[in-house]
């Protein structure tokens, strides 16, 4: 859920390196709607999420920044029972597959990351990719009441090379921002940001995943972005 965009970015890099005011009183507005973000995330874990996506960005190869574009699919099936860090959990794997084109060359790709949630309350426990094993320092729950303009820190992941947790890679800090709806009662935009740091607390990468959530706590993907010293990536849901 939280680190998928960093995985997309790494894969793209690997592919190409290897190849107003008024004078009258305003009408009274209804109070802002309250949304249950934790319930929305729990529904997403239970029901899954999928979308066609467009890809764009830049990748630096041999000191030269090259633009790329592409398209693919984002799939996140319903979670299944699993074990994570010695405890019962739910696992949900996000996969992005498709093709990207840069400098006249088109390459196919497929990459995935698996997120883990507590079976009891749906708290986020951590995630695993091909090169990392990340564990929440404390189980992460999203707020149960948010309104447009809400924001806050969610928690911190400890990053390791593998499940032995013997080699530290640093930390990842998670936060969220809720966008103010254009119209009262309309769906609300949610941005979940992951800032990735090395063991010296140097910022390596910033990833943002954007969701839309209805008043019924149904979440859909809007897009995602990632940025590090090697380039940028923007993912836009069709």
Model-predicted segments: where are they?
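Short, low-complexity, Pro/Ser/Thr/Gly-rich segments in the mature regions of secreted, periplasmic
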Residues: 222-238
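Short helix-loop boundary/capping segments
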Residues: 130-202
């Amino acid at each position: 859920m939280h680190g998928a965009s960093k995985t997309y970015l790494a894969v793209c890099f690997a592919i190409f390196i290897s190849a107003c005011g008024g004078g009258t009183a305003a009408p009274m507005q209804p109070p802002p709607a309250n949304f249950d973000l934790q319930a929305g995330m729990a529904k997403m874990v239970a029901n899954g999420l999928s979308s066609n996506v467009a890809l764009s960005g830049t990748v630096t190869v041999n000191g030269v920044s090259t633009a790329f574009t592409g398209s693919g699919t984002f799939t996140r099936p319903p979670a299944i029972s699993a074990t994570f860090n010695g405890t019962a959990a739910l696992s949900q794997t996000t996969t992005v597959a498709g093709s990207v084109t840069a400098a006249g060359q088109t390459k196919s790709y497929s990459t995935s990351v698996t997120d883990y949630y507590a079976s009891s309350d749906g708290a986020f426990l951590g995630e695993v990719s091909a090169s990392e094993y990340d564990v929440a320092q404390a189980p992460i729950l999203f707020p149960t009441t948010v309104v447009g303009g809400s924001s806050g820190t969610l928690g911190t992941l400890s990053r390791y090379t593998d499940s032995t947790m013997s080699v530290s890679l640093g930390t990842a800090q998670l936060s969220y921002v809720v966008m103010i709806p254009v119209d009262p009662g309309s769906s609300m935009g949610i941005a979940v940001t992951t800032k990735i740091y090395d063991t010296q607390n140097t910022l390596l990468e910033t990833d943002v995943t954007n969701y839309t959530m209805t008043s019924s706590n149904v979440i859909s993907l809007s897009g995602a972005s990632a940025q590090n010293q090697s380039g940028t990536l923007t993912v836009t849901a069709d």
